[in-house]
């Protein structure tokens, strides 16, 4: 299926349901504005989504949270069921799925509200649901809340680990609240004379080399004093994966367990899954009996 860029959450779900392959038990879906593929199941006339795919789906519509948070919320509200027909494939308990009929814009708001209330009060209300604490810091740039005065500054390692799920819109909200350690608002780039007091003396040369100014390269890696600075937040996110070894971009092709740190590498990998009968036999494995088009 082609991707549906620009649609709202419920409209996207309806589009997926309307284009499920007739007579197919499994259909391929491309998530909006991404190269990520998921597979939906059609059982007794209903279209079912894998619960574990929900975190990727919601991320496309602005709700970012851990998979465990989203799955637990869906289970607690009784929206999850077991797909008994696939016990042979997914074990005795079957596959946890969510029916497309429960997906709505209201559900999107419910999940976002649940995540915010679980994390605590917000200070940066216009920055997004992930900013749930009044003080955040990226790299050695300290972000304080206006309500806390000059003493409300902390380094990110003192409060939270690096969060690779922050989006650009969230970061824009953070950058609007930048303050130096003396309480002055950070609007201009740092210079040798007026550099922020919180920049360590030993790292000033490296900071100036990589960043030039806070405005030009405000996103700094703090992993083991790496201090690489980047102009765009997504570049910092991608760089951080080299330190953590994380591979968030997983191949959704049934039977394939490959994962990659970069989405472009995943897109390149998808080319190995050709549409020949030989590749279907090798890659789809036990999925073959589910859909006549796979044989």
From Swiss-Prot:
This protein's record includes keyword Zinc-finger: yes
Molecular function terms, GO-annotated: DNA-binding transcription factor activity, RNA polymerase II-specific; RNA polymerase II cis-regulatory region sequence-specific DNA binding; zinc ion binding
UniProt keyword annotation of Repeat present: yes
Zinc finger (C2H2-type): 219-243, 249-273
Descriptive protein name: Zinc finger C2H2 protein ECU08_0560
Pfam families: zf-C2H2
Organism: Encephalitozoon cuniculi (strain GB-M1)
Any Gene Ontology CC annotation: transcription regulator complex
Keywords carried by this UniProt record: Metal-binding, Repeat, Zinc, Zinc-finger
């Amino acid at each position: 299926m082609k991707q549906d860029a620009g649609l709202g959450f419920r409209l996207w779900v309806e589009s997926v349901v309307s284009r499920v392959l007739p007579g197919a038990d499994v259909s391929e879906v491309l998530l909006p504005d991404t190269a990520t593929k998921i597979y939906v199941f059609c059982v007794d006339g209903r279209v079912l989504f894998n619960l574990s795919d929900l975190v990727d789906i919601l991320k496309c519509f602005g709700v970012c949270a851990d998979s465990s948070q989203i799955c637990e919320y869906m289970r607690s509200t009784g929206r999850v069921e077991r797909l008994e027909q696939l016990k042979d494939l997914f074990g005795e308990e079957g596959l946890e799925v969510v029916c497309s009929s429960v997906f709505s814009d209201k559900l999107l708001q419910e999940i976002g509200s649940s995540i915010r209330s679980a994390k605590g009060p917000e200070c940066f209300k216009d920055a997004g649901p992930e900013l749930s604490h009044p003080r955040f810091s990226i790299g050695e740039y300290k972000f304080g809340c206006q309500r806390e005065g000059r003493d409300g500054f902390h380094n990110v390692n003192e409060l939270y680990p690096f969060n690779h799920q922050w989006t650009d819109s969230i970061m824009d909200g953070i950058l609007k609240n930048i303050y130096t350690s003396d309480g002055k608002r950070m609007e201009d780039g740092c210079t040798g004379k007026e550099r922020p007091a919180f920049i360590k003396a030993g790292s000033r040369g490296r900071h100036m080399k990589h960043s030039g100014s806070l405005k030009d390269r405000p996103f700094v890696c703090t992993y083991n004093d790496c201090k690489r600075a980047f102009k765009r937040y997504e570049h910092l996110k991608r760089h951080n994966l080299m330190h953590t070894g994380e591979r968030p971009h997983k191949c959704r092709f049934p039977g394939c367990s490959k994962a990659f740190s970069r989405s472009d590498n995943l897109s390149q990998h998808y080319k190995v899954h050709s549409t020949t009968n030989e590749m279907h036999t090798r890659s789809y494995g036990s999925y073959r009996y589910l859909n006549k088009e796979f044989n």
